[in-house]
Curated annotation (Swiss-Prot):
It comes from Saccharomyces cerevisiae (strain Zymaflore VL3) (Baker's yeast). Belongs to the TDA11 family. One of its GO terms (cellular component) is cytoplasm. The modification Phosphothreonine is found at T236. This is Topoisomerase I damage affected protein 11. Residues 179-231 form a coiled coil. The gene is TDA11. Residues 470-479 have a biased composition (Basic residues). Residues 32-62, 252-306, 332-377, 400-499 are annotated as: Disordered.
């Protein structure tokens, strides 16, 4: 016995506590203070421990995990006033073995199974397997199997310990409730984990959708930037683009509804703007698309013609006036200078009368500079015709019928006969516009109230003498003459100013 064991025994004596292991003492009974310390092995109160010898020859004690008697009074650590500490120790037990014996007091107490219960374990596992409970999920059964395998090698010959262990075995005639509850809790935890995973996946899906939307928007913005760099025409404002994709899909009839009611300046400026914008648009359109667009424009119906009827009529009027003045100055001035003419209400007759007046009043100026005189007369007649035409647009429809019977055919020359034919064509211009036919559009015939009154006076003067008719004619020519601010009254000064 070493000093460590002596120290422990002395402390146990002072404290009156027994700290020996249960493998050396099975049960204790009150012992009176007598001279004996150790009773014989044949006594009823104690059962000696069983030892087995290993292959190395060292002695190992087989420890029992549970007491044979389940009574609080027989507990070895319970202090009793009349109890005496009894320690049975084998002389061959080493110090580390004694330390392990003392540490075994804090180990958990597990109830072992009997050999009879071991025979019923396969049936229990089969019944548990039928309910879908694996044996690995139960810690109680695994610990029981481990202890049972260790107890098979032990030599328990005491009938008292066997009876006590049979009484404390777990009933195996049914399913273990604790195992069912444990499996139920496990399944609930698994369901909660699955639900949490589903929620996490949903959140991740929403986050990915937001990222996808943001990246798609960024891609669209990059495409717009690249298109602006490649095509400078896209940088122009939207109001300057005529052939936008949305505008191309609109039918031509709906586009021309409001265009027909627009004012004259907007109608005149619209073709210029559209031509300018179409050149910008053609930069980003292939030649095939341009050809197809031209074919569609050529094959459009009469609604397109009615759209441009009024601007074309105005252009036609200016063209006829300019053409007439050019022809008159180049070819007809010399041939018609000496022929008497009758004043008519058309712009061409006004130009003729003014030209004849200039020829009669200033022959010296025209002989000195014939080219300058012809140009001045042309400009003068053109300005007079435009002024008379703008003032007589509203009275056009009321005075067209009276114009045809205004003059006598006796005083008409060949040139006047041709002008009468052109006037008859212009009279039917309203019907040509309604039918959509532009072939009959000709120079418009303008007429004012003063002209109408003077024409009536001229028709009445045809029956008078030639001198009286000449005087009326001269007064008409002077009335149709365009006067400027600060201009003298005499005709000679006006002719000199124009020349």
């Amino acid at each position: 016995m070493n000093k460590f064991d002596e120290f422990i025994e002395s402390n146990e004596k002072d404290l009156d506590v027994d700290t020996s292991t249960r493998n050396s003492i099975i049960s204790m009974s009150p012992v009176r203070k007598t001279g004996r310390k150790i009773r014989s092995a044949s006594s009823n109160g104690y059962r000696l421990e069983h030892h087995r010898t290993s292959s190395a020859g060292s002695m190992h004690s087989q420890r029992l995990m549970t007491p044979t008697r389940l009574n609080d009074q027989d507990h070895p650590l319970q202090a009793k006033p009349d109890a005496r500490r009894v320690v049975t120790r084998h002389s061959s037990v080493s110090v580390p073995n004694a330390m392990s014996k003392r540490r075994s007091l804090i180990q958990p107490m597990v109830v072992p199974t009997t050999p009879e219960s071991q025979n019923n374990l396969p049936s229990v596992s089969h019944s548990e397997g039928s309910y879908g409970i694996p044996l690995e999920s139960t810690t109680v059964l695994s610990s029981e199997q481990a202890m049972a395998s260790g107890l098979r090698r032990s030599r328990n010959g005491s009938s008292q310990s066997v009876n006590s262990m049979i009484a404390t075995t777990i009933p195996t005639n049914g399913v273990d409730v604790s195992a069912l509850l444990q499996s139920l809790a496990t399944k609930e935890l698994e369901l909660l984990e699955c639900k949490q995973k589903i929620e996490d996946l949903k959140k991740q899906t929403q986050h990915e959708e937001q990222n996808y939307t943001r990246r798609a928007r960024e891609l669209h913005e990059l495409k717009e930037q690249v298109s602006k760099h490649l095509d400078p025409s896209l940088n122009t404002p939207v109001k300057n683009r005529a052939f936008s994709p949305v505008y191309q899909n609109i039918p031509l009839e709906s586009r021309t509804e409001n265009a027909g009611n627009s004012s004259l300046p907007s109608s005149v400026s619209k073709p210029k703007n559209m031509g300018h914008q179409s050149t910008n648009q053609s930069r980003s359109v292939s030649p095939q698309d341009i050809q197809e667009r031209r074919q569609r424009d050529d094959s459009s119906d009469s609604s397109k013609q009615s759209l441009w009827s009024k601007p074309l009529a105005l252009f036609n009027q200016f063209d006829k006036i300019i053409q007439h003045e050019i022809e008159r100055t180049l070819n007809w001035d010399d041939s018609l200078s000496g022929t008497p003419e009758v004043q008519e209400g058309t712009p061409t007759s006004n130009s003729e009368s003014s030209a004849q007046q200039y020829d009669n009043e200033a022959p010296g100026a025209r002989q000195k500079s014939p080219s300058q005189g012809s140009v001045s007369r042309s400009l003068w007649s053109f300005v007079s015709d435009v002024k008379a035409g703008l003032l007589g647009i509203e009275e056009e429809n009321d005075n067209d019928v009276i114009t045809d019977n205004r003059c006598d055919p006796v005083y008409k020359s060949d040139r006047q006969h041709e002008q009468k034919k052109s006037t008859h064509k212009i009279t039917n211009r309203g019907q040509a516009e309604d039918s959509g036919d532009d072939s009959s559009l000709n120079m418009r015939k303008f007429k004012t109230t003063t002209k109408f009154q003077k024409d009536n006076a001229g028709n009445n003067s045809l029956t008078d003498e030639s001198g009286h008719r000449t005087r009326e004619k001269k007064s008409k020519r002077s009335s149709n003459k365009l006067s400027f601010i600060g201009e003298p009254d005499n005709d000679n000064s006006s002719v000199q100013k124009l020349s």
